[in-house]
Amino acid sequence: MLSPVVHDAVLTPYGRQQCVEFAQANPDFQNIPELIIASPFRRTLSTTLLAVPKTFERLSPQGVILMPQLQETHDFPCDTGSDRDVLEQIEEFKDRGFDWSVLTDDWNKNEGFYAPTPEALADRAKWVRRFVRDRPETNILLIGHGGIFREIDGRMRGPNSGVTVSLSRWGNVECRVYTFQNDDDENATMIPIQEPSLIHAIDKPIDSHVEIEVVA
């Protein structure tokens, strides 16, 4: 399980295995995304390389964006990213074409825009939704974390208890497909799409080190 005291926690061996299994179970899916947007945490960078390796190879470097705004929603050490100079020297990520320039000095300070407050999280989630909606691509793959995905979804605090339960946790390497309600909504509201035939979930116990979501 994810220990809150481990800084920028990495994937467990089991989590890495599940990523590989996802890639093997979904060969056709690798051809769908036109853009990858990933949280710059170590575990999400590993997920990107292991779960969608062919997609990464096809799109990198221009089609792979690191997005600090996709980081997790708490200030625990495990949910705090590493400094740019640390990430650049990690063997797994070196020479893979990641553009680290987006990692400003404050990206992992959990303050201001990145503070773990309800107001800041709502603003950050809206920022992500609007960024994605304004992109020219149709099929965009977000690789991030359950906490920020719940904020991006926006229905967690709604009256529907079934939705709340569904959003309470993402399964390991689980994909959820969304579209936008319209093109000019100030909030960039997203609505879920069910496409079970497109994406096969890995039916295994949840390990919170692995999160993946699709936004279409």
Which residues fall in each region the model found?
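Short glycine/proline- and acidic residue-enriched helix-loop micro-motifs
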Residues: 5, 96-116
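A short, acidic, amphipathic alpha-helical segment used as a generic capping/interface helix at domain edges
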Residues: 121-137
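Active-site-proximal alpha-helix that buttresses catalytic centers in soluble enzyme cores
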Residues: 1-62, 66, 118
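Catalytic metal-binding/acid-base residues of hydrolase active sites
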Residues: 42, 70, 147-149
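Acidic, low-complexity terminal tails and accessory targeting/binding regions
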Residues: 3, 72-93, 150-216
